[in-house]
């Protein structure tokens, strides 16, 4: 009996791991459109958190900031410095809201996957997770970044923007065009892969061992999640700055 009990425990653990599914989705039919409800729900939760924090922090502004206002101003200063460093002193100001929105949405989304008990909410299909755990979200963010740096380049340089594709020699035209396609791909898959892998590792560890053991991994996940948000925002700002400068 003593020999059989550990074997049963191992089998149960393996069965729980096999239940960790990837790619199961819950859809809602809205008119003629099929909506990915999991991403929609968690994204709106993240947006509500950001709006709530903004309202609380700015409802009673003081000349000398204290408490939550001080924290918000520190975050905004960090985003402003990041944008200015990558885009440049003269052109950075209009892009602070865009880069800030990207950074804060990704940051809160990533942390929500580690801190929120999404999986206790039962759905007919699949399960809730961080918005950035889904490739649809990360691709959308990357495409927004692509639109932003195309707009920045065309707005600043006009049609001469397209001259970059034949610099320093027309032979590099295919490679330069391909580069514009690989930028959003690298942004989206890097963010998606890291967040998905982190959540899967934690889910497997919780299935195998007691709750206390995965805690260090969860803290590591929080750190890497913050780094991924910073990397995405930094690269987005760098691409925008590069498109306005006119060289690689």
From Swiss-Prot:
It holds the Pfam family ATP-synt_A. GO terms for cellular component: chloroplast thylakoid membrane; plasma membrane; proton-transporting ATP synthase complex. Keywords: ATP synthesis, CF(0), Chloroplast, Hydrogen ion transport, Ion transport, Membrane, Plastid, Thylakoid, Transmembrane, Transmembrane helix, Transport. SUPFAM superfamilies: F1F0 ATP synthase subunit A (SSF81336). It is a multi-pass membrane protein. It is found in: Plastid, Chloroplast thylakoid membrane. Its main location: plastid. The keyword tRNA processing does not apply. GO terms for molecular function: proton-transporting ATP synthase activity, rotational mechanism. The chain crosses the membrane at residues 37-57, 96-116, 135-155, 200-220, 221-241. F-type ATPases have 2 components, CF(1) - the catalytic core - and CF(0) - the membrane proton channel. CF(1) has five subunits: alpha(3), beta(3), gamma(1), delta(1), epsilon(1). CF(0) has four main subunits: a, b, b' and c. HAMAP family: ATP_synth_a_bact (MF_01393). Belongs to the ATPase A chain family. Key component of the proton channel; it plays a direct role in the translocation of protons across the membrane. This is ATP synthase subunit a, chloroplastic. It comes from Angiopteris evecta.
């Amino acid at each position: 009996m003593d020999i059989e009990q550990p074997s049963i425990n191992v089998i149960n653990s393996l069965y729980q791991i096999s239940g960790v599914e990837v790619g199961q989705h819950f859809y809602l039919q809205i008119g003629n459109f099929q909506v990915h409800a999991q991403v929609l729900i968690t994204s709106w939760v993240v947006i509500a958190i950001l709006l709530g924090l903004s309202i609380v922090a700015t409802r009673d502004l003081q000349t000398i900031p204290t408490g939550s206002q001080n924290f918000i101003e520190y975050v905004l200063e960090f985003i402003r410095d990041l944008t200015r460093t990558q885009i440049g002193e003269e052109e950075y100001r209009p892009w602070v809201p865009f880069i800030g929105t990207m950074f804060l949405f990704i940051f809160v989304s990533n942390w929500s996957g580690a801190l929120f008990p999404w999986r206790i909410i039962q759905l007919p299909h699949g399960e809730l997770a961080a918005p950035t755990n889904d490739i649809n979200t990360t691709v959308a963010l990357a495409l927004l970044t692509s639109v932003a740096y195309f707009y920045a380049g065309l707005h600043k340089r006009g049609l001469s923007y397209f001259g970059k594709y034949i610099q320093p020699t027309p032979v590099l035209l295919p490679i330069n065009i391909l580069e514009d396609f690989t930028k959003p791909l690298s942004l989206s898959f890097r963010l998606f892969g890291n967040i998905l892998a982190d959540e899967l590792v934690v889910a497997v560890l919780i299935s195998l061992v007691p709750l206390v053991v995965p805690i260090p991994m969860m803290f590591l996940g929080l750190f890497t999640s913050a780094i991924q948000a910073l990397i995405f925002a930094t690269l987005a700002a760098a691409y925008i700055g590069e498109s306005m400068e006119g060289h690689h």
